[in-house]
């Protein structure tokens, strides 16, 4: 199956909104129902890519419609040539007692990443990630007295006898490039799934927003609300799968157009005018031998 691997690295706090709720946070972020992990839904990402290619890269609308499908009102006429998957979380930044912050992940997250790579035909991430219950595997640069201390969690370190951290860094380099691998190297903490879940639920950014009445200078009735943001320095990944219907000339068109997003900066989610939602994108084409290479 022809596929492209997309990396999304948040440069500013990002709000892929899920609508309003009656809870403490009025405008929460998108989350997977079964895990509670932050996610950027495929339809949201598809819209961002489509808009960027049309408005910034000035790609011909006929080409965009062929690749992404026609606008909603004409969706019945034909299907697009690609399927844009949900952007799943891979690394989440958390305050660390040593090293300022760490990139945390978990066995569940890494094994899902491995599974998704295999779906796209990439089989060069073969390391088995062990189940962790009360210990972590972490870079030496962020450990203190044989522990990694993340927010209020102090987790004992187990020896990395199988070179798991090195394998993870290598996989990140192959998937997202050397720049990303160097960024996370020395800051990785593979922690128990339950602790990871708690951190991605409790360590997002909650921001109070206020709407002021211009005439009175006071807060309008109902003008105070709370928004949730994914923090800067979070890494997501997504797969773009090409339909088997695509012919050779279609493949060339897809490669030409999608290649324009590699290394570029996109805006995802709400509050663009206050600097939110800027991400850096990487794009890797899955090769026939199961590896990846940059576009």
Curated annotation (Swiss-Prot):
Annotated CDD domains: Cmr4_III-B (cd09682)
Q: What is the effect of changing residue 15 to A?
A: Significant decrease in cleavage of target RNA in the whole Cmr complex
As recorded in UniProt, its EC number(s) are 3.1.-.-
Q: Which UniProt keywords apply?
A: Antiviral defense, Cytoplasm, Endonuclease, Hydrolase, Nuclease, RNA-binding
State where the protein is found: Cytoplasm
Question: A Gene Ontology CC term for this entry?
Answer: cytoplasm
**InterPro entries, A to Z:** CRISPR-assoc_RAMP_Cmr4, RAMP_III_fam
Q: Would the keyword Hydrolase turn up in this protein's UniProt record? A: yes
> Which one GO biological process term can you cite for this protein?
defense response to virus
Q: Which domain of life is it from?
A: Archaea
Q: What is the effect of changing residue 26 to A?
A: Nearly complete loss of cleavage of target RNA in the whole Cmr complex
Q: Name one GO molecular function term.
A: RNA binding
- Pfam families according to UniProt: RAMPs
Please tell me whether the keyword Iron is annotated for this protein: no
PANTHER family documented for this protein: CRISPR SYSTEM CMR SUBUNIT CMR4 (PTHR36700:SF1)
What does the similarity note say?
A: Belongs to the CRISPR system Cmr4 family.
Q: What does the subunit comment say?
A: Forms oligomers in isolation. Part of the type III-B Cmr ribonucleoprotein (RNP) complex, an elongated RNP with Cmr2 and Cmr3 as the base, with Cmr4 and Cmr5 forming a helical core along the mature crRNA (39 or 45 nt in length), while the complex is capped by Cmr6 and Cmr1. The 5' end of the crRNA is bound to Cmr2 and Cmr3, while Cmr6 and a Cmr1 subunit (Cmr1-1 or Cmr1-2) cap the 3' end of the crRNA.
The task this protein performs is described as: CRISPR (clustered regularly interspaced short palindromic repeat), is an adaptive immune system that provides protection against mobile genetic elements (viruses, transposable elements and conjugative plasmids). CRISPR clusters contain sequences complementary to antecedent mobile elements and target invading nucleic acids. CRISPR clusters are transcribed and processed into CRISPR RNA (crRNA), formerly called psiRNA (prokaryotic silencing) in this organism.
Name of the protein this chain belongs to? CRISPR system Cmr endoribonuclease Cmr4
User: Can you name the source organism?
Assistant: Pyrococcus furiosus (strain ATCC 43587 / DSM 3638 / JCM 8422 / Vc1)
Gene of origin?
A: cmr4
């Amino acid at each position: 199956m022809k596929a492209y691997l997309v990396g999304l690295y948040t440069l500013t706090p990002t709000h892929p909104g899920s609508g309003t709720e009656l809870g403490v946070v009025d405008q929460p972020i998108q989350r997977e129902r079964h895990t509670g992990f932050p996610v950027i839904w495929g339809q949201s990402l598809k819209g961002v890519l489509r808009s960027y290619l049309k408005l910034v890269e000035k790609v011909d609308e006929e080409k965009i419609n062929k690749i992404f499908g026609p606008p909603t009102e004409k969706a019945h006429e034909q299907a697009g040539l690609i399927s844009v998957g949900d952007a799943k979380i891979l690394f989440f930044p958390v305050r660390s007692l040593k090293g300022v912050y760490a990139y945390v992940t978990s066995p569940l997250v890494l094994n899902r990443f491995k599974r998704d790579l295999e779906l796209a035909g990439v089989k060069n991430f073969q390391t088995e990630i062990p189940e962790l219950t009360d210990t972590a595997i972490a870079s030496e640069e962020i450990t203190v007295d044989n522990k990694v201390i993340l927010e209020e969690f102090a987790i004992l370190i187990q020896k990395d006898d199988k070179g798991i951290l090195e394998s993870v860094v290598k996989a990140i380099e192959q998937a997202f490039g050397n720049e990303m691998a160097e960024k996370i190297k020395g800051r990785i903490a593979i922690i128990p799934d339950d602790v990871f879940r708690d951190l991605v639920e409790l360590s997002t950014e909650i921001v109070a927003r206020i709407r002021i009445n211009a005439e009175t200078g006071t807060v309008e009735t109902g003008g105070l609300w709370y928004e949730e943001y994914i923090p800067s320095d979070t890494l997501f990944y997504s797969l773009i799968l090409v339909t088997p219907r695509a012919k050779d000339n279609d493949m060339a068109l897809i490669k030409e157009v999608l290649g324009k997003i590699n290394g570029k900066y996109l805006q995802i989610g709400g509050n663009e005018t206050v600097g939110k939602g800027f991400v850096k994108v990487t794009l890797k084409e899955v090769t026939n031998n199961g590896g990846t290479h940059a576009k």
